[in-house]
């Protein structure tokens, strides 16, 4: 059982052996009582569970509280590395059924980041490396520097699971919801499973991927109301 205790402006979380701290010895604290109670309840589940996805939730949570100026800069550099390999820029064989589905689902997301952020992404059929507009890196860097710790954490983990800055930008801008995010990043896997039949190993990997994705979204939703205040 995790207890929530208010000290000054913040609510802190306690287990039997004391205040809950991150791997870098930072205390977990929030300013909103509703968020604090919800987080305490879910952390209790995670600490009790032997499920690796629940441990992953705690890792992501701790990651967000451990971000400082130096580590934030390192994370931004890692995110920028994905610019040239964005999932949404690489399409299936021209005029194929899958390519048609990719255009319908992915093109609106590319148009959104172009209109809102002036980020220009090119697409190709196949895996040949693409050269994008030179201003993309600087513009994305400015966007990322404005994100708070939680936002940057969510962005970073979505990037790691989707390999797409375009998807992450659309999600944090509230242009798409989490269901749409999953549909976009799992399009090819879902298509192959339906087209070629169920592959036990591939299906298990996709389900595992979704379970980790759900934990990222769980953290985002816990703090969403706090972000909007």
Role assignments for model-derived ranges:
Residues 1-70:
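An N-terminal structural lobe/cap that precedes and organizes the functional/catalytic core
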Residues 26-30, 87-90, 97, 167:
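Short cationic amphipathic helices and targeting signals
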Residues 31-34, 38, 70, 104, ...:
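Conserved active-site and cofactor/substrate-binding residues in soluble primary-metabolism enzymes
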Residues 39-40, 167-171:
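Buried hydrophobic packing segments
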Residues 73-139:
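Internal, conserved structured core segments that host functional sites
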Residues 123-169:
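A contiguous pocket-lining binding segment that forms or flanks enzyme active sites
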Residues 172-224:
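Accessory, usually C-terminal, subdomains that scaffold auxiliary metal cofactors
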């Amino acid at each position: 059982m995790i207890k929530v205790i208010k000290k000054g402006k913040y609510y802190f979380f306690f287990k039997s052996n004391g205040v809950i701290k991150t791997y870098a010895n930072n205390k977990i604290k929030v300013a909103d009582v509703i968020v604090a109670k919800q987080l305490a309840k879910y952390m209790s589940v995670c600490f009790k569970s032997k499920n690796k996805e629940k441990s992953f939730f705690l890792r992501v949570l701790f990651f967000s509280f451990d971000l400082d100026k130096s580590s934030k800069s390192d994370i931004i550099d890692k995110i920028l590395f994905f610019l040239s390999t964005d999932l949404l820029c690489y399409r299936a064989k021209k005029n194929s059924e899958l390519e048609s589905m990719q255009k319908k689902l992915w093109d609106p997301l590319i148009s959104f980041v172009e209109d809102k952020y002036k980020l220009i992404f090119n697409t190709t059929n196949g895996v040949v490396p693409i050269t994008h507009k030179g201003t993309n890196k600087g513009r994305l860097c400015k966007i990322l520097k404005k994100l708070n710790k939680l936002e940057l954490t969510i962005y970073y983990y979505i990037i790691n699971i989707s390999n797409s800055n375009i998807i992450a930008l659309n999600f944090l801008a509230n242009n798409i919801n989490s269901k749409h995010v999953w549909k976009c990043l799992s399009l090819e896997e879902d298509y192959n499973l339906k087209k070629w039949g169920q592959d036990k190993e591939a299906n298990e990997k996709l389900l595992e991927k979704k379970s980790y994705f759900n934990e990222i979204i769980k953290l985002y939703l816990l703090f969403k109301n706090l972000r909007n205040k």
